[in-house]
UniProtKB/Swiss-Prot annotation:
Annotated binding of Zn(2+), by residue: 173, 175, 186
SUPFAM superfamilies documented for this protein: JAB1/MPN domain (SSF102712), RuvA domain 2-like (SSF47781)
Residues covered by the MPN domain: 102-224
Protein name in UniProt: UPF0758 protein AFE_0358
Pfam families reported in the protein's UniProt record: RadC, UPF0758_N
Organism field: Acidithiobacillus ferrooxidans (strain ATCC 23270 / DSM 14882 / CIP 104768 / NCIMB 8455) (Ferrobacillus ferrooxidans (strain ATCC 23270))
Amino acid sequence: MAITDWPVDERPRERLLQKGAATLSDAELLAIFLRVGVVGKSAVDLAREMLLNFGSLRALLTASHHDFCVHKGLGDAKYALLQAVLEMGRRHLAEEWQRGDGLDSPLRVRQYLSATLRDRCREVFAVIFLDNRHRVLRFEEMFLGTIDGATVHIREVLKRALELNAAALIVAHNHPSGVAEPSAADLSLTRRLDQAMQLLDLRLLDHFIVGDGEPLSLREQGGW
């Protein structure tokens, strides 16, 4: 049965408009995104099948172009739409990090880093540049690597900090494996960066590692 044949108060779109998006299941939200089903399946049926095939909503949202498009009912247009929606979500979060915003909560840092770096398929090293009152000057993804690591050039980080007249930095990188445990190389890099920054009277406030769960703070783990 097509969704248009359902009672009005059971249709996902109408329920969203009446009661809010938070009241809908993952399958119902996905059905609104899909708009239509395929022969013999409503959009909700197709959405449930997709969630079952991918294993979770997150796995579906972070699927590669190829893995997404091989499923019946999907294709380039749906993949492009999904990527646009996800990017709008990231930019919405980024609006909190406009120049002049203060870092008033470690939770805000974790939320933004998780949303920005968690599901990347390659390792990314990013830097939050701050002024002497810990207000955000700029967030930049400075180095992009492979699934196993990213080469970080400390000289380039320091150069950019001086260009922005930064007084302090928070650095972060993701582990595509999802395991947010610091490696010996992570700790060594952090120590070398901290030492180099001290020579320029700059402060390294923290180094976060982003995995599947909450980003791990090396500062809270006892430093480096």
